[in-house]
From Swiss-Prot:
Keywords: ATP-binding, Endosome, Golgi apparatus, Kinase, Membrane, Nucleotide-binding, Protein transport, Transferase, Transport
Quaternary structure (record): Component of the autophagy-specific VPS34 PI3-kinase complex I composed; and of the VPS34 PI3-kinase complex II.
Enzyme class: transferase
Catalytic reaction annotation: a 1,2-diacyl-sn-glycero-3-phospho-(1D-myo-inositol) + ATP = a 1,2-diacyl-sn-glycero-3-phospho-(1D-myo-inositol-3-phosphate) + ADP + H(+)
GO annotation, cellular component aspect: endosome membrane; Golgi apparatus
Region listing for G-loop, in residue ranges: 183-189
Protein name in UniProt: Probable phosphatidylinositol 3-kinase VPS34 homolog
UniProt source species: Encephalitozoon cuniculi (strain GB-M1)
GO biological process terms on file: phosphatidylinositol-mediated signaling; protein transport
Length: 446
């Protein structure tokens, strides 16, 4: 198999036993087979300058300059920094190659100044979080008192300073909006930090106590699944700083702790428009298609701890999930359903038979598309798993996904069982109980 060219690679990838294929891919990746990355990218159907290139371990320095944009080079910096921070990359040659690579990039596009500004912003956000966590209070209000009390006693803490944006390469952060910092009443009490930039206000979340490398793995997979399904699924960026710390990009939208009824949902995504209007129809269509896409993605990867706080919808009607701390069946709530449909969404679907049937049909189509393309997803996972930043065992996650996709059955039988699963998710008693428990927990932490 080491003699594959692009066409032979495609044929073997489609015909071989999945485990033989995985073993061959891993061997080729480990040996750094010349041109392997181009064959894999061609097989996966991704762009020539796709961010996937930064996950090939043997590509270094000049090999990456023409393949990655400046934005992806910065993403690569944070990945490499993580690996060095975790002391999992001990080769001095590797370190020198990294330094030389970024010095060359700095000459071309001034990348080091941007990185310095980003790191200064990270240090300031860490300082803010440390104020809220002094004494480790288990109440949101106590943490807020500490933060705003410090700002009152030391008004200079909120003084203006220029930083580089972490997620918008061309934006400059002019100010951290200290009075509007929020603390979430979840178990690790992450903070939401508003930033005033030269392009408007953006927001980021700082988390401590969560491993955001799982989120990164899931989001890379969802981006690829989005292409396979032909549905524009919302994703966002994350920067894991360590195994227990990281920063998350905030996508504008509203979560389902604030959408508590069908009427709330209709008002948000339809804006009180006449349902006969084309714009309203398109937004409903977008909502249903993205709901189906995310439902299938979360089902296949066994994403757990789904609650109203980590399900969101954008103003243009796109549904999406956030917070992927528990994946591949490792759900802290054993009573949870394998597909979670929040109550307002359930009521929205069953209120209109046409919308409900459209949801069932689109979910089935998305499931079949992922099932038919599962080999490509597994090849993507092989590439990601070669990076030290991720700690997933392919011998666990691939069989898990195969079981969810019911690869041992005929396509028709697998679809029938999935349709039964998705029908059961609408109005699931397990979901109602799990969400009630989550609300009680959040109330106790306020």
């Amino acid at each position: 198999m080491e003699e594959w060219d692009g066409d032979v690679f495609t044929w073997n990838a489609g015909k071989e036993d999945i485990y033989t294929l995985i073993e061959s891919i891993l061997r080729l990746l480990k040996n750094g087979c010349k041109g392997m990355e181009n064959m894999v990218v061609k097989y996966l159907g991704t762009g020539a300058t796709d961010s996937l290139y930064m996950y090939f371990p043997w590509l270094r320095g000049r090999d990456l300059e023409s393949r990655l944009s400046v934005e992806h080079q910065i993403d690569r910096f944070w990945k490499i920094r993580f690996e060095l921070h975790e002391e999992r990359t001990n080769s001095m040659d590797r370190y020198e190659d990294i330094v030389s690579s970024f010095l060359a990039l700095d000459t071309k596009c001034g990348i080091l100044g941007k990185l310095e500004g980003q790191m200064a912003l990270v240090d300031e956000i860490r300082r803010i979080y440390s104020i809220t966590s002094q004494g480790s209070p288990r109440k949101k209000r106590l943490r807020e008192y500490r933060l705003h009390g410090t700002l009152c006693l030391h008004p200079g803490a909120g003084s203006m300073r220029l930083y580089a944006s972490l997620f918008s390469l061309d934006a400059t952060v002019k100010e951290i909006i200290f009075p509007e910092i929020e603390i979430f009443p979840s178990s690790t009490f992450p903070i939401l930090v508003p930033l005033r930039t030269d392009r408007g206000v953006s927001r980021i979340i700082y988390k401590k106590g969560d491993d955001l490398t799982r989120d990164l793995f899931v989001l890379e997979t969802i981006r690829y699944m989005s292409r396979l399904m032909g549905v524009d699924l919302v994703t966002y960026k994350v920067i894991p700083l360590s195994r227990k710390e990281g920063i998350v990009e905030v996508v504008d939208g509203i979560d389902f702790t604030r959408i508590r009824s069908r009427k709330d949902l209709e008002m948000y995504i339809e804006e009180d428009r006449d349902p006969r209007h084309q714009e309203s129809f398109e937004k409903r269509k977008v909502f249903v298609s993205t709901l189906c896409g995310y439902s299938v993605a979360c089902y296949v990867m066994g994403i757990g701890d789904r609650n109203p706080g980590n399900m969101m919808v954008t103003r243009d009607g796109k549904f999406f999930h956030i917070d992927f701390s528990h994946v591949f069946g490792r759900d802290p709530k054993p009573i949870s359903s394998r597909i979670t449909i929040a109550r307002p969404i359930r009521d929205y679907l069953v209120n209109d038979e046409l919308i409900y049937q459209d949801f069932l049909a689109r979910s089935g189509e998305a499931f079949l598309q992922i099932r038919r393309s599962c080999r490509k997803i597994f090849v993507l996972w092989c590439i990601l798993a070669q990076n030290r930043i991720f700690q997933f065992d392919l011998n666990e996650i691939i069989p898990f996904a195969q079981a969810r996709l019911r690869m041992e059955m005929s396509e028709q039988r697998a679809l029938e069982l999935f349709e039964k699963e998705i029908r059961g998710a609408v109005g699931s008693l397990k979901t109602s109980v799990a969400h009630l428990i989550n609300r009680v927990g959040m109330f106790l932490r306020r």
